[in-house]
Amino acid sequence: KSLDLKNPVLDECIVAYAMNDQPLPMLNGFPVRLIVPGYFATYWMKGLSWIRVLDKADENFWMKTGYRIPDTPRGNTTPEDVKAGNVKTVPISRMPVRSFIVTPDGATKLVAQLPLTIRGIAFSGYGSANKMEISINENFSAVSGLTTKMWTPAELGEDHGPYSFRTWSHTWTPPKPGRYVLAARATDGKGNVQPDDGVWNPGGYLWNRIERQEVVVGRSS
């Protein structure tokens, strides 16, 4: 991979040789690994053996052909434009803001009137995730759009610094039995908000649509 010398991310890059006060494990890139904060892992070179200064971008497969995205907002395009050859591409770079619901999952047994904690993680390639919101809707289609009136603030865990995963949680008491759809939305320090529409490109890159989890709430005994 190659990075422009004017790219500010170079000031944050690390050549790592240890992890948790131990030599870097083989699976994590021993003996040294390049860390490019906020960027997709294709830049995090394992087994780093050399760094070269070039007078132009590297033209190897992984820069010129692989891991490329449309040069459009959010890397979005259409199959028709790809087929017609109308898509200009650029190397993939930063990860978009994204969040996940970790628990409950679809197999969790929930009980009406019994409080539970919804938990998840959030991160962004543009800094820290500094806002989380949760939406809980009964009999709500998992493919329908969400409105701003549906969002409730969630509690964020400790901030370990830019680009790190950040936990979040929200306590919810299901009011009655039924099917509910949970949705989570993150916002990062640059003001980027997780969208509720998908993105399409041939590689499937940059997908960060709001995640949903359907749960079933039963009656209390």
Predicted feature locations:
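Extended, aromatic/histidine-rich regions of cofactor-dependent oxidoreductases associated
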Residues: 1-221
